[in-house]
Amino acid sequence: AAEVAPCELTVAPSGLSFCDKVVGTGPQAVKGQLIKAHYVGRLEN
């Protein structure tokens, strides 16, 4: 089963902030590979 991790924000060079709430146990994605993700977008104001 996946493990729930504390949410520490990572900021990408583009300014996008993200965190991994659940870290899976499968193989890591590589650049160019199609992935499936669930996300929540929020605005500052």
UniProtKB/Swiss-Prot annotation:
Enzyme kind, highest EC tier: isomerase
Gene Ontology MF terms in the entry: peptidyl-prolyl cis-trans isomerase activity
EC number(s) given by UniProt: 5.2.1.8
UniProt keyword Cell division, yes or no: no
InterPro entries assigned to the protein according to its UniProt record, in alphabetical order: PNSL4/FKBP13-like (IPR044183), PPIase_dom_sf (IPR046357)
Disulfide bonds: none
Leader sequence segment: none
Reactions the enzyme catalyzes: [protein]-peptidylproline (omega=180) = [protein]-peptidylproline (omega=0)
Tissue: Expressed in leaves, but not in roots.
Primary location class: plastid
Subcellular location: Plastid, Chloroplast thylakoid lumen
Record flagged with keyword Plastid: yes
Entry function: PPIases accelerate the folding of proteins. It catalyzes the cis-trans isomerization of proline imidic peptide bonds in oligopeptides.
Family assignment from sequence similarity: Belongs to the FKBP-type PPIase family.
Protein name: FKBP-type peptidyl-prolyl cis-trans isomerase, chloroplastic
